[in-house]
Amino acid sequence: MRNIIKISALALSLLTAAASANAQVVLTQKNMSLELANQIASASVAACAANGYAVAATVVDRAGIVRAVQRADNAGPHTLGASQQKAFTSASAKNTTLAMMEGSQKNPAAANLVYIPGYLLLGGGVPVRVGNEVIGAVGVGGAPGGNLDEQCAMAALDKVKDQLK
């Protein structure tokens, strides 16, 4: 009986060791290339310019680190910071900043999101997805309303959608 218990314990420890050895310790993730980031930033600024808005667009990778920035002629200096914070917020939360803003207005507890360093709850931040995976975000600032900033970001993502498969 003791031998059976010892053999069972040994077998269990070997199975546990084998399972641990198969655990994934190095992750493989999709991320934002510089080429794609530049295309999205450029297309965002162009989409807003077509509607008469001088904006800045910032594209960040999945970690919220800036990959590309473009600022239209005559865009205000505040548009750079706003676009970066919107992109960071969207990448971090994996949601549009317009949806987050609207949610925080309806839910008093969510209003505390404004205290997270780097977050900006104004429309214009949109996640960049490959399938269901967020690989970054684009933030647009400078149009006369966050909903218009978001429209420019969405137009840019529509322009590169074939590359996001």
Question: What name fits each language-model region?
Answer:
Residues M1-A9:
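Bacterial N-terminal signal peptides that target proteins for export
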Residues S8-A18:
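Bacterial N-terminal signal peptides
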Residues N22-K165:
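Flexible, solvent-exposed loop/hinge segments and secondary-structure transition points
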Residues N3, A21-N22:
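Generic short amphipathic/hydrophobic targeting helices enriched at N-termini
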